[in-house]
Amino acid sequence: LFALNLGFYPVLWVLSIARVLRHRDRVRADFGHYGRAVGFFTTVAATCVLGSQCVVIGESVTAAIALWIAGIVLWAGLVYAVFALLTIKAEKPPLAEGINGGWLISVVAAQSVAVLGAQLAPHFGDHAPHALVFALAMWLGGGMLYLWIISLIFYRYTFFPMSPSDLAPPYWINMGAAAIS
């Protein structure tokens, strides 16, 4: 799988950039959509998972560090872009329509940055404690985000009517977010 990921990762970036260049309006609409905006956090998780594979399987610390830095930059940019945009929107959907398990991808993104940072820390020599503190901060921040989001999802499950179609694939992310946390 590692070899496949090394091939698929750049292809996904090329396709993502092509989508931005060819369909700017759709990408902009996705950033402002409560169901799709959080999906952009998958780029952070993918970047850091590949970085983890580089450390564990590929034994390429340099590539892993580059991917970790890219993951941090992507995470920081997306946190401000996605959450700020959704927060300041004038028109907002009701909670039952606006929240789903896909929101937990933001947690998975933060936790993946933390995991890769912890894996890389031993390679930083005297700076290892700094990397570990940063990884801990990311993990704790992701944990807080998990508590906030899962509380809203639980509230939605418990107090709003649900149909089988409401249990679409994004709801299954609930378990993945708990696992990485």
Show which residues each predicted segment covers.
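Helix-coil boundary and interhelical linker segments in multi-pass alpha-helical membrane proteins
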Residues: 1, 54-63, 117-133
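Transmembrane alpha-helix boundary signature
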Residues: 17-26, 52-63, 85-88
